[in-house]
């Protein structure tokens, strides 16, 4: 059975699962058929747990617990010898003496490293590093991250922020000497073995102690052997500019451990800030408005909408688009630190969401300085990116914004106000009337044009016009005096084909009414309906007959047409319009129906032709079939 150590917290979802916490040891672990899950025993209870939340405890870590069997070797009993051979194996040169075992014990005792750069923890299980601190290395958790103890606190820290120290026989720690021609390599895994010296830190060249007298000879005189170095190309590139800083920051050979910071101080996280790259004006009440170069306190990156962050600026809290700002750090703005990669995604989909702590890599200071210099050397600022889409704005907000910005929606156009009644001109002319009168018959216009005389009483006409324009409140049709017909100046002009002149009307009234008259149309209609006979009498038996009329019949017709009131003319025009419109509609419908009937006739004819053809084909087929039957009958009878 294999043991595993818990790297991330996990809360059980089902009854057959284990709830595990960071640092716990799960015993007697075995793999299950289901991919991504293991089964083990914890606190007397056996259950399942995801394999990407734990790490297998390797055999090398058990050497620390074997101190008691090593002490028994001093007594020289056979049991200790058998245990030592089964643990370490039988060397090629024979059984080693006891002094060599003591050296191995001392060399595998501890690994220590010295902090070269400050590091602020981003998660609870990480250590806060200060320059010059000495950390006891426990193990390499994963590539780029080590587990160690600092100030009696166990936690994780990035391996590229420290430098491993060399441990001598006397238990003293010394910094590994940097050769000017060597390049720093990645961290190595501690793997103790018989007849071998401990690994050197970061692949630097040191002067190892020579091993003699155990049957191997002086085969390590050129230097120590590197075991299982896992140096990626990207890691070596990241660490190349680190060398001059390391050379400058190297202090004395030994330093005492500084215990100045408490655990609570190590858990304080730095505030996050953003620097705006482009100006932005908020379109909603919950959005921030900022200019280029302002610093926004970043509160949260999770707002429920992709592409939006929540922050605070000038005491106002709101959301803003993340592509208009770049994140900076308040405590350490010089460089962003490397992220730790997440654990392998072997477990089912929901399980990685339960990871409580996710490590982050942070790049080194020199790289950030280089990036900063390249940003400052950019020739021109890029164009502002497009604002990401946001949730639709409620109608009330949109209307308020439109009102505040001064935008007014266009209203429905009102009816135009009719012009004031025409005033008689010097020569007795009257302005042209509305186009509604164009619908009157052409014959009527011709009749009037033939009977148009000169106006003998211009003074009476002017007085009537002034009087009717003043009497807007009360209209009495009995007071209207008869007068001779008037001829418009454009009546004798050549006419375009299909166009008609406006109709004739009483000279005392204008066809265009003021708004007050339009409002009082019902009263006028009532008065007109009350005395139509009186109006006819007055018009037919006028005391002032026209001397210009040729016959009495034509005079009566002219008078009846001349003394039509504006209301009657308007009603007549409206009825004519309605009749004409309805007539046009009926004509269009009739034409459409005729087209439909013609189309149906054509389709019906085609169907009939098709049926006739089918019928003919059926007849021929039937006749052929009957002939075949007759032939078969004859053949049967003849046989």
Swiss-Prot record:
The modification Phosphothreonine is found at residue 565. The keyword Glycosyltransferase does not apply. Residues 168-177, 356-379 have a biased composition (Basic and acidic residues). Its main location: cytoplasm. Phosphorylated on tyrosine residues; probably by c-Abl, Fyn and c-Src. The keyword Disulfide bond does not apply. Widely expressed in fetal and adult tissues. GO terms for cellular component: actin cytoskeleton; axon; cell leading edge; centriolar satellite; cytoplasm; dendrite; extracellular exosome; fibrillar center. Seems to act as an adapter protein between membrane proteins and the actin cytoskeleton. In collaboration with CBLC, modulates the rate of RET turnover and may act as regulatory checkpoint that limits the potency of GDNF on neuronal survival. Controls CBLC function, converting it from an inhibitor to a promoter of RET degradation. May play a role in receptor clustering and cytoskeletal polarity in the junction between T-cell and antigen-presenting cell. May anchor the podocyte slit diaphragm to the actin cytoskeleton in renal glomerolus. Also required for cytokinesis. The Pro-rich domain may mediate binding to SH3 domains. Potential homodimerization is mediated by the coiled coil domain. This is CD2-associated protein. It comes from Homo sapiens. The gene is CD2AP.
């Amino acid at each position: 059975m294999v043991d595993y150590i818990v790297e991330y917290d996990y809360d059980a979802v089902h009854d057959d699962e284990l709830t595990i916490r960071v640092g716990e040891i799960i015993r007697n672990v075995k793999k299950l058929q289901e991919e991504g899950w293991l089964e083990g025993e914890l606190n007397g209870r056996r259950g399942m747990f995801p394999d990407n939340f734990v790490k297998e405890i390797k055999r090398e870590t058990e050497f620390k617990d074997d101190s008691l069997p090593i002490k028994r070797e001093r007594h020289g009993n056979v049991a200790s010898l058998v245990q030592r051979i089964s643990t370490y194996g039988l060397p090629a040169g024979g059984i080693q003496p006891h002094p060599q075992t003591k050296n191995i014990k001392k060399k595998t005792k501890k690994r220590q490293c010295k902090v070269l750069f400050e590091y602020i923890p981003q998660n609870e299980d990480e250590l806060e590093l200060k320059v010059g601190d000495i950390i006891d290395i426990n193990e390499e958790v994963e590539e780029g991250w080590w587990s160690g103890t600092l100030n009696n606190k166990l936690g994780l820290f990035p391996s590229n922020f420290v430098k491993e120290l060399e441990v001598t026989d006397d238990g003293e720690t010394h910094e590994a000497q940097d050769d000017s021609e060597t390049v720093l390599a990645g961290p190595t895994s501690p793997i103790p073995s018989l007849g071998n010296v401990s690994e050197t830190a970061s692949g630097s060249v040191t002067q190892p102690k020579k091993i003699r007298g155990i049957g191997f000879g002086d085969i390590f005189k050129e230097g120590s052997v590197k075991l299982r170095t896992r140096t990626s190309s990207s890691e070596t590139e990241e660490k190349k500019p680190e060398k001059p800083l390391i050379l400058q920051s190297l202090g004395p050979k030994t330093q005492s451990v500084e215990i100045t910071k408490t655990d609570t101080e190590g858990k304080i996280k730095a505030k996050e800030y953003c620097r705006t790259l482009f100006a932005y004006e908020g379109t909603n009440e919950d959005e921030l408005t900022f200019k280029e170069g302002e610093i926004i306190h970043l509160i949260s990156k999770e707002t429920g909408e992709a592409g939006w962050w929540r922050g605070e600026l000038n005491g106002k809290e709101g959301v803003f688009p993340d592509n208009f700002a770049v994140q900076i750090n308040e405590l350490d703005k010089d460089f962003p630190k490397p992220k730790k990669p997440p654990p392998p995604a072997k477990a089912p989909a929901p399980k990685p969401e339960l990871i409580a702590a996710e490590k982050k890599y942070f790049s080194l200071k020199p790289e950030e300085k280089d990036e900063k210099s390249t940003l400052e050397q950019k020739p021109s600022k890029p164009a502002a990116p497009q604002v990401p889409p946001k949730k639709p704005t409620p109608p009330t907000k949109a209307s308020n914004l439109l009102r505040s910005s001064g935008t007014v929606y266009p209203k429905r156009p009102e009816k135009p106000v009719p012009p004031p009644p025409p005033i008689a001109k010097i020569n007795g002319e009257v302005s042209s009337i509305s186009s509604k009168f164009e619908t009157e018959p052409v014959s009527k216009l011709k009749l009037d044009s033939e009977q148009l005389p000169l106006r003998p009483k211009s003074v009476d006409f002017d007085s009537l016009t002034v009087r009717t324009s003043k009497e807007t409140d009360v209209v009495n049709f009995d007071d209207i005096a008869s007068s001779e017909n008037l001829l418009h100046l454009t009546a004798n002009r050549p006419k375009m084909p299909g166009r008609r002149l406006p109709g004739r009307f009483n000279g005392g009234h204008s066809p265009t009414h003021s708004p007050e008259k339009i409002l009082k149309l019902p009263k006028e209609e009532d008065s007109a309906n009350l005395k139509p006979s009186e109006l006819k009498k007055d018009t037919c038996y006028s005391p002032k007959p026209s001397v210009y009329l040729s016959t009495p019949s034509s005079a009566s017709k002219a008078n009846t047409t001349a003394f039509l009131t504006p209301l009657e003319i308007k009603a007549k025009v409206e009825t004519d319009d309605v009749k004409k419109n309805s007539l046009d509609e009926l004509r269009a419908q009739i034409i459409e129906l005729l087209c439909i009937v013609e189309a149906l006739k054509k389709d019906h004819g085609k169907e009939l032709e098709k049926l006739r053809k089918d019928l003919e084909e059926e007849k021929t087929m039937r006749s052929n079939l009957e002939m075949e039957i007759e032939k078969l009958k004859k053949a049967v009878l003849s046989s």
